[in-house]
Amino acid sequence: MSMQPPERRDIPAATVTRLPQYLRSLHTLAAGGVTSVSSDELAAASGVRSTQLRKDLSHLGSHGVRGVGYDVAHLTAELARALGVTRTWPVAIVGMGNLGRALAAYSGFAPEGFDIVAVLDHDPALVGDSVGGLSVRPMTDLPILVAEKGIGIGVLATSVAGAQSAADSLIAAGVEAILSFVPVALAVPPHVSVRRVDLATELHVLAFLRQSDSIAATTPNPTDVGRAG
C-alpha cells in the first residue's frame, strides 16, 4: 500500500476537487476509532462510487490491500501531503461585509490547516472593528501583513465593483492563490491560481435540477399513454 510522491500537475483537476472530501471522511473515521477502511466504505462516506475513489487514489500511487483496504492514518497523511496541508496556511480575508465576517468567524478552517490571520476592508468605517478575534485592517496594510505573516492565500468577499482592485492588491503583495466568493471573472497573471465560489450559480443549478425532477414526475410516459387507449 506504499505511495510514491505524485507530481502536482500529474493529478487531474477533477480528482483534486474530490481529494479534500476523502480527507474529511478519513478524519471522521479516525475520530470514530476506525483504523482501516475498504474502498466501498470510504466511497460511501465521501458520496462517490468506489470505482471513482480507487481511480482517484491510484493517481497518488495507492491501490490498497485486497481484503484489508486502506490504513486510515497512512492514507490521511498521504492525502494531506498531496493537498499541501501538512503545514498551516496563513489566510487573509478581504471584504468585511456579512459574508466576509461569517467566513472570518467560521471555526472549521483551522482544523483543516487554514489559519485566518488577517481581515481587511477598504472602508475606513470598518477599520478597527473586531471580527473573528482579529482587528479589521485597511488595505494599505496588506503588503506588510503578507510579509510579516507569510500569507499565501487570499479570500475575496468584496462587492463586484471592488473585486478586481482587491485581487490586484493581493497579487501585488505577493499572494498567488485566491478564493473568490464574488460572482465576477478576475483578470490575473498566469502564475496566480483562482477558485471561484458562486453561490447564486449553485442555487440556479439546484433550481434547474428540481424543475427537471418536477417535469419528469408530471410528464406522462408515452408507453402508458398508448396503453390508456
Indicate residue ranges for each PLM-predicted region.
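Basic, low-complexity intrinsically disordered segments
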Residues: 108
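Glycine-rich Rossmann-fold phosphate-binding loop(s) that bind the pyrophosphate
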Residues: 96
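HTH-adjacent hinge/linker in prokaryotic transcriptional regulators
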Residues: 36, 40, 44-91
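NAD(P)-binding Rossmann-fold cofactor-contacting core
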Residues: 111-132
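Hydrophobic/small residue at the entry helix of a nucleotide-binding pocket
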Residues: 99
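Extreme N-terminal segment that seeds HTH/winged-HTH DNA-binding domains in transcriptional regulators
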Residues: 1-35
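Phosphate-bearing ligand-interacting subdomains
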Residues: 22-30, 132-229
